[in-house]
């Protein structure tokens, strides 16, 4: 019951862009779910990469929307912030790839998961920011 109330509260307070994006991506994630749960290593990795690519499209979209709204003096600051985030994501992926404790295949899964989770989190962060601007 408490979880339901928290979810309802989050939905009420979420902004219009975030709501639309969340609904769009829910459909996309459901599309890839069978492959992610298939048990086939190649199928799972391929689905993960494709899903991350879809989140990347959303990231680029919301990034550009924010950029259009920002005053000129804030644009360079925002671009630098995004570049720092991209570098941190690359470093996290590289670290995950280097972690072969459970073997190289698991390192690939770890890297794919890291890229997906970080990209999704950044999209949600920027969507909230964009909604606050409107």
Regions found by a protein language model. Name each.
Residues 1-6:
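Sec-dependent signal peptide recognition
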């Amino acid at each position: 019951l408490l979880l339901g109330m928290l979810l309802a509260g989050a939905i009420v307070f979420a902004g219009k862009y975030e709501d639309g994006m969340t609904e769009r991506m829910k459909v996309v994630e459901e599309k890839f779910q069978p492959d992610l749960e298939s048990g086939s290593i190649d199928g799972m990795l391929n689905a993960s990469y494709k899903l991350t690519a879809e989140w990347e499209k959303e990231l680029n979209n919301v990034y550009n929307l924010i950029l259009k709204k920002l005053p000129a003096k804030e644009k360079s600051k925002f671009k630098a912030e995004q570049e720092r985030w991209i570098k941190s994501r690359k470093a996290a992926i590289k670290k995950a790839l280097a972690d072969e404790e459970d073997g190289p295949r698991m390192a690939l899964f770890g890297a794919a998961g890291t890229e997906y989770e970080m990209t999704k989190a950044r999209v949600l962060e920027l969507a909230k920011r964009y909604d606050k601007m409107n």
